[in-house]
Amino acid sequence: MSNGSRSLNLFFSKNNFKGSFNSFNEVPNGNLPECCFIGRSNVGKSSIINAITKSKKLAKTSKTPGRTQNINLFVIHDKINIIDLPGYGYAKVSKMKREELSNLIENYLINRENLKEVFILIDCRVGIKDSDIDILDFICENNKQFSIILTKVDKCAVNFINKQKESLISLLKNYKTHFKTIFSSSSNKNIGIVDIQKEIFSLT
């Protein structure tokens, strides 16, 4: 492990869970810069957050889609907040609950003034879906910067990963004003985690 990677791990390992909130107005205000993680249900948001923070239990993981239904706030080294937003695109919740979660996500993305970057997670095996594109459109309409994290790349062949990235790059030409980069990642194999850490650290 390089000294740079070791320093990043030390930075991110100083973390704490500040709370879980089912209303945007409940989320504490503060002066720290903030980034958020968003994606379809069961895309691996909590696992990636745990890999970044070198903590197995900071963000609660579940094999059950739709488990994250609140805004979860984590503070890293008293320098930056990481937000885990509810997953979207899960059909087995009621229409009323889907609307409630959609409003929660939209209120956060519109009104959070210290939000510096949105990380949109996409399962590499599945690729981008219409619900992801809806989120991309909404983020850009509200003038937020975003990056894409392709998750679970350890479960895909290299050629398949490259095709998924090529497809994304072609699509993202339409979003070049707000798009930053694409990360390939695996929480199980620690692939791409240092690069994501560097990006988050650059926001502090």
Annotate each language-model stretch with its function.
Residues 77-115:
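Conserved nucleotide-sensing/catalytic segment adjacent to the nucleotide-binding pocket
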Residues 57, 67-70, 81, 97-101, ...:
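Helical mechanochemical/support elements of P-loop NTPase systems and associated helical scaffolds
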Residues 104-179:
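Conserved C-terminal guanine-recognition region of P-loop GTPase G domains, centered on the G4
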Residues 1-92:
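Conserved G1/Walker A P-loop phosphate-binding module
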Residues 11-24, 155-204:
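Canonical P-loop GTPase G-domain recognition
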Residues 42-43, 49, 72, 78-79, ...:
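Structured catalytic cores of enzymes that bind and process phosphorylated ligands/cofactors
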Residues 67, 80, 87-90, 125-127, ...:
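Conserved nucleotide-binding/hydrolysis micro-motifs of P-loop NTPases
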